[in-house]
Amino acid sequence: MIRKAEERDLTAAAALAAELWPEHTPEELLPEYRALLKNGDGAVFLASENGREAGFAQVQLRHDYVEGTETSPVGYLEGVYVREEARGRGVAKALLKACEAWAAARGCREFASDCELDNGGSLAFHLHTGFTEANRIICFTKPLTPERGETHEY
């Protein structure tokens, strides 16, 4: 069963999200999900099987440029995760369909997502569910710290 998360579901959603993104704790993610519910620019969907949370998906509206798209806003799959014991039964696909329907109801004509370059499972899921690859990029960062003795004002 797929349902749109409400306030009472956010602790479970944050716990599932922390399984997908282990660099974050549920306590860190909970305020983000509360804000998502409040501002209406995104939603979280939960999948339940046999009375237990089996997975979640997070969708948001993106108003900035999204690789490979031509319209705005774009529905964006921020993350989808299904617990191992529930995989292979169409749960992720059902969560995706709920996210797509949510975005379409908000006027989106395109839907997008991303995955890490080395995440073969996610790549296969995206291709299997009708996404086409738009681009591959490598992003770079570096700290902005002045060299010893250097100061610049612009």
Predicted region positions:
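Conserved GNAT acetyl-CoA-binding A-motif
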Residues: L96, A103-C115
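Conserved acetyl-CoA-binding loop-helix of GNAT-fold acetyltransferases
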Residues: V82, G88-A101, A124, H128
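Conserved beta-strand in the GNAT
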Residues: L46, R52-L61, Y76, Y81
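Helix-loop element at the rim of GNAT/NAT acetyltransferase active sites that forms part
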Residues: A14-E28
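A short beta-loop-alpha structural element at the N-terminal edge
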Residues: M1-A13
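Conserved acetyl-CoA binding element of GNAT-fold acetyltransferases
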Residues: E70-E84, I138
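Active-site rim helix/loop that mediates acceptor-substrate recognition in acyltransferases
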Residues: T25-L46
